[in-house]
Amino acid sequence: QAAEARGQAHVPPVLRLPHYCAVCPHNTSTRVPEGSRAMAGIGCHFMAQWMDRRTETFTQMGGEGVPWTAISRFTDEKHRFVNLGDGTYFHSGHLAIRQAVAAGANITYKILVNDAVAMTGGQPIDGELTPQQITHLVYHERVARVVLVSETPQTYRDADLAPGTQLRHRDEMDTVMLELRDVPGVTVIVYDQVCAAEKRRRRKRGTLADPDQRLWINPAVCEGCGDCSVQSNCIAVEPLETGLGRKRRINQSVCNKDYSCLKGFCPSFVTLRGAALRKDRPRGGANLSSVPEPVVPRIERAWNLALAGVGGTGILTVSAILAMAAHVDGKVPMVLDMAGLAQKGGAVMSHVRISRADRPIAAPRIAAGSADLVLGADPVVADSKECILLCSPDRT
């Protein structure tokens, strides 16, 4: 109770909010045209609520857009957009579309097909569901209009799409939204673009082509207007402080080669073909002969370790390595990793509990005030309520 009270009373001066990955399809798909608003749902697109995207409220899976059916009766607002992930659609989101059709709501569902359950590790959705199949499913729900928007529309030229389905390039997304918001009834945009994290994994594994082209911003030409960030909403476009003021640069390690930042009205971009990232020079092996072997404490009860850091920097990798080390050493580890969104730049924590084989533990979560060690890879996250709640002056 004392630990819980300390955690609740603690007010951190700043919080880390996660952001979409570089090249995330939601960078484009969650935009709304001027004068319109959107509603969120379950998925990484949930993060649009704390971005400048006029996206408000969210529901449980299968409830996307349902509140608008009631709200629309008491407002002069004529239309709303609703974001709906493909995994959620397969789970129960189709029921939300069905109720909207039955209610005669003026609403546009944006079904975001990213080919993976990105927020829990990039697994495929629990069943077969292609963009072509979605067009047929919503067509038979009797929606007013269906538009398939893709970064590679040419792959669907001869596809079996539902009758009346329009095929548009993602560069036309704003035009498509302006058209559909004026169509009475329920309309659907099937937005097809592979999850950025999954695209990066596939390129590393050699199962997806890696474009031989990179973009570089010439700081001598850049005026720091930020239009590249406005157009792309990409986390790989970073501020660059110079003697002439703040400019922009592209973090080449983060960039996933989407090139949407090129849409910015700017002459400072340089396109490089055949260029590769310069590798760090190999360092000599560290001399660890003078480092004494650590004294491993005898575990009489569960030993609890909390890791706190920034998403995308390897916090979950470290927790997995420590858990495997405990397993190799004959101990019984349990790990609870923070999941639910692609936490790029956001706060991430992992609970690692280690016990003896003859004294197993029942739950992976560290109880309030029970952490033996906190590895704070980032001071902001280590100072968060969630982390302070685990600490105790007598034990941590």
Put a short name on every predicted segment.
Residues D52-E56, A116-G127, P131, R157-T165, ...:
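Short beta-alpha connecting loops at secondary-structure transitions
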